[in-house]
Amino acid sequence: MSQANSSNQIKNQSPNSPFSNFLADLKSLYPNFRFQPGPRFLFRPPNTIFYEPSNPNDTNNSFQDFALQLLHELGHAISGHRNFQLSIDRIKIETEAWHAAQIILENHPNLQTKYHLFFNQDFAEAHLDTYRRWLHQKTTCKKCGLTMFQDKNQTWYCPHCDLI
């Protein structure tokens, strides 16, 4: 990371920024979880939530986006997500985490008021779409184009090419 980007992130994470204040509020509300800066938003069981520090030059990373992604990772933590066995389970736990994020926000109306936050279903669906596309790519047979299925050993089979 360049020094300019680093100083911009620090400036945007200043003690009075909504990013820092929101993070402090979540730490206070959920003291059993550790919130750490990292290269991306990620929940690492059993209790660490990594967040991508905001960059004021990135217009795609608004405070609303930052807050929703952080609530999503907290949703994983509160839901007790550890890992997934089957690829279809990935979509299930991602959906559960977005639902948990919505519930967290509903249970803390003070966060909604203080930070002018609202749960953006379109934002959540856009993120879920990335997993849906990933699963579609993973399940499409490269030979014939049919949808494959995964067994309990995480092996993929095409109903046409592999089972005939």
Q: Language-model segments: what does each one mean?
A:
Residues 5-10, 58-64, 107-164:
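Long, well-structured alpha-helical subdomains associated
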Residues 77-80, 104, 131:
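TPR/TPR-like alpha-solenoid repeats
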Residues 73-90:
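Catalytic Zn2+-binding segment of zinc metalloproteases
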Residues 62, 66, 89-92:
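Short alpha-helix boundary/capping segments
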Residues 11, 40-44, 85-92, 133:
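Anionic, Ser/Thr-rich low-complexity intrinsically disordered regions
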